[in-house]
């Protein structure tokens, strides 16, 4: 399994950020599940959840999260690319289908997070 983590820009969070996700397959949506975001780039995200998620091309994942307190949540769909076990959770790599605007919002939020770090 080849994991592409050599993107130009990926931010690793000291403390994971929580968010929600749901899966869509053949137009049907699953109930929302909780996730923790461990790292993010403008076009990808690593999430952890105790749930077993399917890794197949016919299922898309929709993630919703706010990188900054009080900011409008981002709602982006994507594809689960790989799975890795960590302690009691599964870590999933997700390729996000981001627009240029989504990518810009992610970059600006990360810049703000870095600036506010002690």
How would you describe each model-predicted region?
Residues 51-55, 91-111:
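Short solvent-exposed strand/turn elements
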Residues 13, 29, 57-59, 72, ...:
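Residue-level preference for beta-strand/loop junctions
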Residues 35, 76-81:
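Short beta-strand-centered aromatic/proline hotspots
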Residues 1-40, 111-118:
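N-terminal helix initiation/capping motif
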Residues 17-24, 58-73:
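Short conserved beta-strand and strand-loop elements enriched in small hydrophobics
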Residues 42, 84-88:
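Short, conserved beta-turn/loop elements at beta-strand boundaries and strand-helix junctions
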Residues 25-58, 62, 93-95:
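Short strand-loop-strand
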Residues 56-66, 104-117:
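Extended Gly/Ser/Thr-rich low-complexity repeat segments
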């Amino acid at each position: 399994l080849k994991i592409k983590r050599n993107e130009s820009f990926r931010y690793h969070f000291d403390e994971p950020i929580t968010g929600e996700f749901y899966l869509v397959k053949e137009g049907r949506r699953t109930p929302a599940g909780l996730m923790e975001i461990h790292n993010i780039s403008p076009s990808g995200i690593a999430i952890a959840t105790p749930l077993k998620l399917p890794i197949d091309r016919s299922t898309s994942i929709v993630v919703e999260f706010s990188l900054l307190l009080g900011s409008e949540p981002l709602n982006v769909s994507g594809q689960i690319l790989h799975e890795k076990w960590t302690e009691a959770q599964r870590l999933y790599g997700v390729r996000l289908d981001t627009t240029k605007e989504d990518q810009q919002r992610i970059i600006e939020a990360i810049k703000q997070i870095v600036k506010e770090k002690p």
